[in-house]
From Swiss-Prot:
Superkingdom: Bacteria
One Pfam entry name: UPF0253
InterPro entries xrefs: UPF0253
Disulfide bond residue pairs: none
UniProt protein name: UPF0253 protein Ent638_0728
Origin species: Enterobacter sp. (strain 638)
Family: Belongs to the UPF0253 family.
Amino acid sequence: MEIYCELIRKRYAEIASGDLGYIPDALGCVLKVLNEVATDNSLSESIREKAAYAAANLLVSDYVNE
């Protein structure tokens, strides 16, 4: 957990404590957010490319949208 930024650790603690809701389809959630980042023209091309690459790698992995 120490390798993640403070904001991620904070959200993790909030989910674990029940203050924030847990999303069972975590991969679907990640893919949705990565898609939003990749299509956000207000962000740098570098960030958008990183998001697109990460999403594509998830899609190539064992992820199956049921």
